[in-house]
């Protein structure tokens, strides 16, 4: 567009501000221009006649003086026109014509979106947004605010709280430093280095060196004093932490008032450049007068007062705690190391100061004849030798082990010696106290156990207990607490629910791994049970429960062997992974047997209220407990009508599906196997060796047992890496007639054949009470069972998916049979019968064997 065209928009006069248009692209770099006011006055070089909004004139197409034009726009035109006679600028953005490469943006147009997002407000000098200076200013401003890290999250609670604290710093004013900011952290660390240097170097320089005009000494003093003066200024802009209510003061006025009332005087006195004043005064006085200025070097000790800033040291300790959390150090170890290091460092620092003081006082007195320096003729010795003897003298006094090379003779040395002894005794007492507290805090549980056992010993002495009782009590405490005592209930009670469950599951992991009841159950059921267990220890010969008493607990065996005793002299062994005492909890009755500990037993007990509370939420597990209880009662020659009625009701109503019934039968089968192991003499000690790898997985055990129960082709237990694939071998037998029994084997292992019956669709996994349990399986003597194969072998076949045969009359059942009253139904096989298969009815009915022999023969016939 040229000057003759009406390219300008209505109302775009220099004296008016048009409405903002679409944001233009960022212009090329241009010299910084001052930001114009919203309504600039008319240009004095152009006529200020108004133009109509409907008649845009040529002045509407002129660039404003305040606009930023590109170099191409400055090639031609007058009064701010763009080159080539075509205005290429617009107050609202770039021209919409074809010539868009030459553009200038008017001052009336607002900043672009990129500038608003990437820059702050322009400075008073007209600095454009997005410049390098603004970027550095933003980065440095972020250093003054608390960052989002582990330390700040622990201090403020959440990321949102940290962001609110950052907004507080921004709104508090310019150059306000947060005490937890990164800048303050690095600054405090730098000041710590200067503190250590001044605490060590300044006393040595004042005491043992005469010439203070050397270049290293001047550089050290200049740098130190400069940093302390800067620290004095920064303290007026640093927030103050109120330890009582954890409030952080960020108001500049409050910071100034509080700093003036506390540490300002000490910091100001310590920051005065005394050395520079001495150097200036030295040129205006003669040398004789300057000799007396040596005594004025004591003024340098005012800097020591400024370096003992306890608040800064405490702030450093808080940051060290942050480092400990980052590097995953334990709090006890970190605090112990910090306390010991601080105490040792303070004692060494006091020894250093005392050593310098031992030489400084005689030096200020021009080394009198009775001082230790003159007596030893060490006035003209080197500073290292003088410092070594002075430090030895000071440490001898502080540790109260002597006076050094000779006893003090002058009054000054006597007072210095007494001062050293007082300081040393104080440090020694502090060290003993800290060391004692450290030792007690590192092993508080053992200390608590020792204190408790001392009370037990006094109790035994007071009641004059015999020696055997005292030994039993001692053994109990050793096995129960193992040298450490703590309130576990209180510790777990203070934790939240998820964390408490994780800890309980971890503590009881061995119990869960050894119990198929837990390993194959719902994880929620396992967690609910474990959170209610109580740990107990019993010694050999202790009767855990007695027959005929009211049961209030059941027990789970983690380690140990127990014997189940009845009045009929029938005994049954239980070991790791078993449980007992659940029968009376299920029936609300009395104990049906006594349980005695054969070894040291580590058990977990469960009260009756907690037991019923958990089982109300998991009915299948109640059914599993009831089924195992019926099987155990049958093995010791007893029965419970209440449990039988409950199980029959569940079977008839079809509450549980086939999968749940199979799991229940696996639990029953594994319980029988564990009893057989204990009866065969394989007793487990208090701390048994770890089982073979193929037995450690309870899930693999269940899968292998199920596969072997339903697959007659598997002639031996599945052991090895292929064990986990065994569920694919599980097959259901189609309904059909029961295959005929195989040819009989040896008479000792061949039970009498049970009457067969036609098969029908199965409705329950149990036979009717009183019916004989018929089993079909290969014969395997019990002595051939190895330790590795017993837990994985299918000693009791799982129930097939068919209906048990109708039960015969009660009179047809042998009276002396030890077969369980609730046994699995006849098992159907899909493969052809092998010659070595035989019916597995209990031989005890025909041969009149002892109950233990009957159980063993029943085990071999079932296998």
From Swiss-Prot:
Biased amino acid composition, Pro residues: 17-47, 734-755
Intramembrane segments: 387-408
Keyword Secreted: no
Entry keywords, A to Z: Ammonia transport, cAMP, cAMP-binding, Cell membrane, Glycoprotein, Ion channel, Ion transport, Ligand-gated ion channel, Lipoprotein, Membrane, Methylation, Nucleotide-binding, Palmitate, Phosphoprotein, Potassium, Potassium channel, Potassium transport, Sodium, Sodium channel, Sodium transport, Transmembrane, Transmembrane helix, Transport, Voltage-gated channel
Catalytic reaction(s) noted: Na(+)(in) = Na(+)(out); K(+)(in) = K(+)(out); NH4(+)(in) = NH4(+)(out)
Region (Involved in subunit assembly): 131-182
Result, substituting residue 321 to E: Shifts voltage dependence of activation to more positive values and abolishes pH-sensitivity
Pfam short name (any one): Ion_trans_N
GO molecular function: cAMP binding; identical protein binding; intracellularly cAMP-activated cation channel activity; molecular adaptor activity; PDZ domain binding; protein-containing complex binding; voltage-gated potassium channel activity; voltage-gated sodium channel activity
GO CC field: axon; dendrite membrane; dendritic shaft; HCN channel complex; membrane; neuronal cell body; plasma membrane
Tissues where this protein is expressed: Highly expressed in brain. Detected at low levels in heart, in ventricle, atrium and in sinoatrial node (SAN).
Compartment(s) where it occurs, according to its Swiss-Prot or TrEMBL record: Cell membrane
Biological role stated in the UniProt entry: Hyperpolarization-activated ion channel exhibiting weak selectivity for potassium over sodium ions. Contributes to the native pacemaker currents in heart (If) and in neurons (Ih). Can also transport ammonium in the distal nephron. Involved in the initiation of neuropathic pain in sensory neurons.
Family: Belongs to the potassium channel HCN family.
Assembly and interaction partners: Homotetramer. The channel is composed of a homo- or heterotetrameric complex of pore-forming subunits. Heterotetramer with HCN1. Forms an obligate 4:4 complex with accessory subunit PEX5L; regulates HCN2 cell-surface expression and cyclic nucleotide dependence. Interacts with KCNE2.
Entry note about domains: The segment S4 is the voltage-sensor and is characterized by a series of positively charged amino acids at every third position. The ion-conducting pore region is between segment S5 and S6. The cytosolic C-terminal domain contains the cyclic nucleotide-binding domain (CNBD), which mediates modulation by cyclic nucleotides.
Protein name in UniProt: Potassium/sodium hyperpolarization-activated cyclic nucleotide-gated channel 2
Protein's gene: Hcn2
């Amino acid at each position: 567009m040229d000057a003759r065209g009406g390219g300008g928009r209505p109302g775009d006069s220099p004296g008016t501000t048009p409405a903002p248009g679409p944001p233009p692209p960022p212009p090329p770099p241009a010299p910084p221009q001052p930001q114009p006011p919203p309504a600039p006055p008319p240009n004095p070089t152009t006529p200020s006649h108004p133009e109509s909004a409907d008649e845009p004139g040529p002045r509407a197409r002129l660039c404003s003086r305040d606009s930023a034009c590109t170099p191409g726009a400055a090639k031609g035109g007058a009064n701010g026109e763009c080159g080539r006679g075509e205005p290429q600028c617009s107050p609202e953005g770039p021209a919409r014509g074809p010539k868009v490469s030459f553009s200038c943006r008017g001052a009336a147009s607002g900043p672009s979106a990129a500038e608003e997002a990437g820059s702050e407000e322009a400075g008073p000098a007209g600095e454009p947004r997005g410049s390098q200076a603004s970027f550095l200013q933003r980065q440095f401003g972020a250093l003054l605010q608390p960052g989002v890290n582990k330390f700040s999250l622990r201090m403020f609670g959440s990321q949102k709280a940290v962001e609110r604290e950052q907004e507080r710093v921004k709104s508090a004013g310019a150059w306000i430093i947060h005490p937890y900011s990164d800048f303050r952290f690095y600054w405090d660390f730098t000041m710590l280095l200067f503190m250590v240097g001044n605490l060590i170097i300044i006393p040595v320089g004042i005491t043992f060196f005469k010439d203070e005009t050397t270049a290293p000494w001047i550089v050290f003093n200049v740098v130190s004093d400069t940093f302390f003066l800067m620290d004095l200024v920064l303290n007026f802009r640093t927030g103050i932490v109120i330890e009582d209510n954890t409030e952080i003061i960020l108001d500049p006025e409050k910071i100034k008032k509080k700093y003036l009332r506390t540490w300002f005087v000490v910091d100001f006195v310590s920051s005065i450049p005394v050395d520079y004043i001495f150097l200036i005064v030295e040129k205006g006085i003669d040398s004789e007068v300057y000799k007396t200025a040596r005594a004025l070097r004591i003024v340098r000790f005012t800097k020591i007062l400024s370096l003992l800033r306890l608040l800064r040291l405490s702030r450093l300790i808080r940051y060290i705690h942050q480092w400990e959390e980052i590097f995953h150090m334990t709090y006890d170890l970190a605090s112990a190391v910090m306390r010991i290091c601080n105490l040792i460092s303070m004692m060494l620092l006091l020894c250093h100061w005392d050593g310098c003081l031992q030489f400084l006082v005689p030096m200020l007195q021009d080394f009198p004849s009775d001082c230790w320096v003159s007596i030893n003729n060490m006035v003209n010795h080197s500073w290292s030798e003088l410092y070594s003897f002075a430090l030895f003298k000071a440490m001898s006094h502080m540790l109260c082990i002597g006076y050094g090379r000779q006893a003090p003779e002058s009054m000054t040395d006597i007072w210095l010696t007494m001062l050293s002894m007082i300081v040393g005794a104080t440090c020694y007492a502090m060290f003993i106290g800290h060391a004692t507290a450290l030792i007690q805090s590192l092993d508080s549980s053992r200390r608590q156990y020792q204190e408790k056992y001392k009370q037990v010993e006094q109790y035994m002495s007071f009641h004059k207990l015999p020696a055997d009782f005292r030994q039993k009590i001692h053994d109990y405490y050793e096995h129960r607490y193992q040298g450490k005592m703590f309130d576990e209930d209180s510790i777990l009670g203070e934790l939240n629910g998820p964390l408490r469950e994780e800890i309980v599951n971890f503590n009881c992991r061995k119990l869960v791994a050894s119990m198929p009841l837990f390993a194959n159950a719902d994880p929620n059921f396992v967690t609910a049970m474990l959170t209610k267990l109580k740990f107990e220890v019993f010694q050999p010969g202790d009767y855990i429960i007695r027959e005929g008493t009211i049961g209030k607990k059941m027990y789970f065996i983690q380690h140990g062997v127990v014997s189940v005793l009845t009045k009929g002299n029938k005994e049954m062994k239980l070991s790791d992974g078993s449980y007992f005492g659940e029968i009376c909890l299920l029936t609300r009755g009395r104990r049906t047997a006594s349980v005695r500990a054969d070894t040291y037993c580590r058990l977990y007990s469960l009260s009756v209220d907690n037991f019923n509370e958990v089982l109300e939420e998991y009915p299948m597990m109640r059914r599993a407990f009831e089924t195992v209880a019926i099987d155990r009662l049958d093995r010791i020659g007893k029965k419970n009508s209440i449990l039988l009625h409950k199980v029959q009701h569940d079977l008839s109503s079809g509450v549980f599906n086939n999968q749940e019934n199979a799991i229940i039968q696996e639990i029953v089968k594994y319980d029988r196997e564990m009893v057989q192991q204990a009866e065969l003499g394989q007793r487990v000690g208090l701390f048994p060796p770890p089982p073979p790898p193929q037995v450690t997985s309870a899930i693999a055990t269940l899968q292998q047992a199920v596969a072997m129960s339903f697959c007659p082709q598997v002639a031996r237990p599945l052991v090895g890496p292929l064990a986990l694939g065994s569920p694919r071998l599980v097959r259901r037998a189609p309904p059909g007639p029961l295959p005929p029994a195989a040819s009989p084997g040896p008479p000792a292992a061949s039970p009498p054949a049970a009457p067969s019956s036609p098969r029908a669709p199965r409705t329950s996994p149990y036979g009717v009470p009183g019916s004989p349990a018929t089993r079909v399986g290969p014969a395997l003597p019990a002595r051939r069972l190895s330790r590795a194969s017993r837990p994985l072998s299918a000693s009791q076949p799982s129930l097939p998916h068919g209906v048990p045969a109708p039960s015969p009359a009660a009179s047809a059942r042998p009276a002396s049979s030890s077969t369980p009253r609730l046994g699995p139904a006849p098992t159907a096989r899909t493969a052809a019968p092998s010659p070595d298969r035989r019916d597995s009815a209990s031989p005890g009915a025909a041969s009149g064997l002892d109950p233990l022999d009957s159980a063993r023969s029943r085990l071999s016939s079932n296998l």
